[in-house]
Amino acid sequence: MELRFPRFSQGLAQDPTTRRIWFGIATAHDFESHDDITEERLYQNIFASHFGQLAIIFLWTSGNLFHVAWQGNFESWIQDPLHVRPIAHAIWDPHFGQPAVEAFTRGGAAGPVNIAYSGVYQWWYTIGLRTNEDLYTGALFLLFLSTLSLIGGWLHLQPKWKPSLSWFKNAESRLNHHLSGLFGVSSLAWTGHLVHVAIPGSRGEYVRWNNFLDVLPYPQGLGPLLTGQWNLYAQNPDSSNHLFGTTQGAGTAILTLLGGFHPQTQSLWLTDIAHHHLAIAFIFLIAGHMYRTNFGIGHSIKDLLEAHTPPGGRLGRGHKGLYDTINNSIHFQLGLALASLGVITSLVAQHMYSLPAYAFIAQDFTTQAALYTHHQYIAGFIMTGAFAHGAIFFIRDYNPEQNEDNVLARMLDHKEAIISHLSWASLFLGFHTLGLYVHNDVMLAFGTPEKQILIEPIFAQWIQSAHGKTTYGFDILLSSTNGPAFNAGRNIWLPGWLNAVNENSNSLFLTIGPGDFLVHHAIALGLHTTTLILVKGALDARGSKLMPDKKDFGYSFPCDGPGRGGTCDISAWDAFYLAVFWMLNTIGWVTFYWHWKHITLWQGNVSQFNESSTYLMGWLRDYLWLNSSQLINGYNPFGMNSLSVWAWMFLFGHLVWATGFMFLISWRGYWQELIETLAWAHERTPLANLIRWRDKPVALSIVQARLVGLAHFSVGYIFTYAAFLIASTSGKFG
């Protein structure tokens, strides 16, 4: 018999319709559902694919370094980071003739180029890279790592090198190795790089392999470490008039706790960063020796979980049974990993702009905006994925007998309470926030702005004051000069920190008012509603009041309206699908808020945000409409400009986004009819009918059409905002 796609499912391969192709693509990575799969082969396949993933990442980062070295302007950017625009790569084939060539020839380049808004120039500069040769060396090294990863992946698919199932199930050893080896050793190595290469580089000392062993990163070398005088490493830090990359104002300290920002680069002190990584390394190296493996010492996770019986018995059997439930469910583990990674990614977005670590990145406004938005969107997709795999866990892996009356079972037992509380919180936030916005809109429309309801965020202001912001006049903790909190750190990190918090030119603890109060609650509404949909989708995945157990229906069971027995109540796939819209919606509000707040800060007209953000028309008119003017003006009677490409992308993004609705607002029968009409016409058209297909064309399933619609909606939404964000920011600040 001929081999047809998909080879992993004989049932699908024999399907006579086009369903074979689409279902084949959809289940290609669902190894669990493949023919002849065993638990051991499942783990081995996933393990080997991780190497492929690493190879792709190394290749991609290698490409970044290579193209900047080849076509960029790294060496001239270093001479003047604030005024030279960093080049990502050349544009081979600029369409639209001479005007396009002129519009895109910038940054000192000979021909058309793309500008880098990723912050890689600032990062490479901070960590000690200085020449194009450095970049080429890095690119080649990463290419080598990529090749190594591919070989590793191939090797671990060979019979002799396939790890056994027991190896994959050995959670303690894996944790020890990942905590010590992955986090601990790599943090220690990074501290070493910062101390030996980056910090000398920031002081005008060029350290490479040829002089690595001759240049002492600290005048007394290891002396202070071996004699216990560790405080010496913090003495003589860089002065406040230090010029980054030169000896002027440079100190000799390597591990400090200065607090605040380097006055010239507006980024964290490199010696503070090294100190931070050393502390992280220390913690993780200890943490990686906590669990019991071959030596009979340390904690057994199973024993820990079994021993934790809640006092008084009011919380059931605590964590009994959880170890095996988690250790035997890849989906549970993936859900936990995605949830953690999602939170970390969002935290990265928040900290990259408020506590910038890379030299001069805080003054590259477009890069700041792009990085914040990028990391928030990534976080949103990762977090929704966590709940999707949580739902799949309940359907495929959850065993009620194994988890009787433990914390997991009790979550399911009182899911109605959880869901209804989330629902109540969402309703409260939604009605009150919208009510305030609409009231304020009406007041402005009728010319009585003084009748707006404006609420000062006093609790948030109090928290900012506790961290040392003096604007609001709260005399509390770090903003009180005679309290114990202030006195404890006054001679170490506090002067630097307090200067940073109270200087209004950076993004640390921005001054907040009624507009911030409202948009904060709008974002809270989005977060709670997204969470409600996702939590309900996971908790009801196996069954609900209407349908007690749907284990055999699988995950991608469609919600098909009340006529089909109320299946919407329990379709985990549909919950995920709805949640992604809410996730995108919420991140829209988050990024609008961040961007508008910062544009007014950077332009020095914060009153525009403060006055216009308290009503919806203000957001529509003074943020969206006002800032899209450059995009609408991308092509005009005077020819092209460097924003034209973003103007085109803005239009194209809207088009992709709108295409999504064609798939979202339609019935399956319509598609089937359309496809049969097209097939009929094709078969009766001369020349066209020379091309035949073997598979009978059938319409997409309900779930597939929703996926196609969702994909277009998401991609279009993000493209549109990306173009808006980059054009409106770079158009203002260059």
From Swiss-Prot:
List of residues binding [4Fe-4S] cluster: C559, C568
Described function: PsaA and PsaB bind P700, the primary electron donor of photosystem I (PSI), as well as the electron acceptors A0, A1 and FX. PSI is a plastocyanin-ferredoxin oxidoreductase, converting photonic excitation into a charge separation, which transfers an electron from the donor P700 chlorophyll pair to the spectroscopically characterized acceptors A0, A1, FX, FA and FB in turn. Oxidized P700 is reduced on the lumenal side of the thylakoid membrane by plastocyanin.
Disulfide bonds: none
Membrane topology: Multi-pass membrane protein
Cell compartment(s), UniProt: Plastid, Chloroplast thylakoid membrane
Assembly: The PsaA/B heterodimer binds the P700 chlorophyll special pair and subsequent electron acceptors. PSI consists of a core antenna complex that captures photons, and an electron transfer chain that converts photonic excitation into a charge separation. The eukaryotic PSI reaction center is composed of at least 11 subunits.
Keywords: 4Fe-4S, Chlorophyll, Chloroplast, Chromophore, Electron transport, Iron, Iron-sulfur, Magnesium, Membrane, Metal-binding, Oxidoreductase, Photosynthesis, Photosystem I, Plastid, Thylakoid, Transmembrane, Transmembrane helix, Transport
Entry-linked InterPro entries: PSI_PsaA/B, PSI_PsaA/B_CS, PSI_PsaA/B_sf, PSI_PsaB
Protein's UniProt keywords contain 4Fe-4S: yes
Co-factor: note: P700 is a chlorophyll a/chlorophyll a' dimer, A0 is one or more chlorophyll a, A1 is one or both phylloquinones and FX is a shared 4Fe-4S iron-sulfur center.
Biological processes annotated in GO: photosynthesis
Species in which this protein is naturally found: Sorghum bicolor (Sorghum)
Protein name (Swiss-Prot/TrEMBL): Photosystem I P700 chlorophyll a apoprotein A2
GO CC annotation terms, alphabetical: chloroplast thylakoid membrane; photosystem I
Reactions it catalyzes: reduced [plastocyanin] + hnu + oxidized [2Fe-2S]-[ferredoxin] = oxidized [plastocyanin] + reduced [2Fe-2S]-[ferredoxin]
EC numbers: 1.97.1.12
NCBIfam families, sorted: psaB
Segments crossing the lipid bilayer: 46-69, 135-158, 175-199, 273-291, 330-353, 369-395, 417-439, 517-535, 575-596, 643-665, 707-727
Residue positions binding phylloquinone: W671
GO molecular function, one term: electron transfer activity
Binding, chlorophyll a B1: H654
PROSITE patterns on file: PHOTOSYSTEM_I_PSAAB
